[in-house]
A protein has these predicted regions:
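Short helix-initiation/N-cap motifs at beta->coil->alpha
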Residues: 12-15, 57, 196-198
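Short hydrophobic/charged patches on amphipathic alpha-helices used for structural packing
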Residues: 16-20, 73, 199-202
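PLP-dependent aminotransferase-like
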Residues: 1-16
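ALDH superfamily catalytic-core signature
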Residues: 27, 33-175
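Short glycine-enriched loop/turn motifs at secondary-structure junctions
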Residues: 22, 55-56, 87-89, 122-123, ...
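Conserved C-terminal structural/oligomerization subdomain of aldehyde/semialdehyde dehydrogenase
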Residues: 25, 62, 158, 165-235
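Structural motif
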Residues: 9-11, 31, 215-217
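Short alpha-helical
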Residues: 13-15, 35-36, 46, 222-223
Length: 235
């Protein structure tokens, strides 16, 4: 680009309003948490600036009875540990029908311990989180969920490593009312949820204030597309 066409300015939160209200700023876009998005939208609305918000998500990955278990499990793992789980559309809530729930849990227990955590410059599967405070927030959410009745299957501790590392964590038996279900966990935590059937799986997927992304695993492509387009409140 020619000089001064595009400029990246890093500022603390207290200076955001000063920038947004400047007459030279025509529009505002933000990718971040819901609380930050709310505050930016408030300021942008006050000064009548066009606004695009891409905020948090608690993305459901629904695994139906006829799904290919291995493909579904691998997709969930890859979709969750990418960038140490710090992706807005990562696989945050894994909702499996009762018929396949235990098979999926067994596959997670088999595969996840083999994943290597370490320096991302090395041949590893997962690196550190963005900051110690972000890591501590995730750990607090995990601990809170366990205290509420979720079963800790893997991970869930702060490792003795230099840096903001958090291990791949698997929670099972997650239910509405638990932090792992109700909130966005922005880190490498897989929350496994059991649904009695397809209808309950869809209801659980939609039982959230978030609506960023979702995925459905089934061998029936036509049914999957119908559910995705007409019944899942995301996207």
């Amino acid at each position: 680009f020619p000089e001064n066409i595009f400029r990246n300015v890093s500022v603390p939160g207290k200076d955001v309003e000063h920038i947004i209200k400047d007459s030279r700023v025509a529009a505002v876009t933000i990718t971040g948490s819901t609380p930050v998005g709310r505050s930016v939208a408030k300021v942008a609305g006050q000064y009548l600036k066009k606004t695009v918000l891409e905020l948090g998500g608690s993305d459901p990955y629904i695994i139906l009875e006829d799904a290919d278990i291995d493909k579904a499990v691998n997709a969930c793992i890859n979709g969750r540990i990418l960038n140490a789980g710090q992706s807005c559309i990562s696989a945050k809530r894994i909702i499996a029908t009762k018929f396949v729930y235990h098979s999926i849990l067994d596959r997670f227990k088999e595969i996840l311990p083999k994943k290597i955590m370490g320096d991302p410059r090395d041949n590893v599967d997962i690196g550190p989180m963005v900051s110690l405070s972000a890591r501590d927030e995730v750990h607090m959410q995990v601990t809170n969920s366990i205290d509420s009745g979720a079963s800790l299957i893997l991970g869930g501790f702060i490792p003795k490593l230099k840096g903001a590392f958090y291990p791949i964590t698997l929670l099972a038996g997650v239910k509405p009312g638990m932090v792992a279900f109700d909130e966005e966990i922005f880190g490498p935590v897989l929350s496994l949820i059991m649904a009695e059937n397809e209808e309950e799986a869809i209801a659980l997927a939609n039982n959230t204030p978030f609506g960023l992304g979702a995925a459905i695993f089934t061998k029936d492509i036509e049914k999957g597309e119908i559910i995705a387009k007409t019944r899942i409140h995301a996207g």
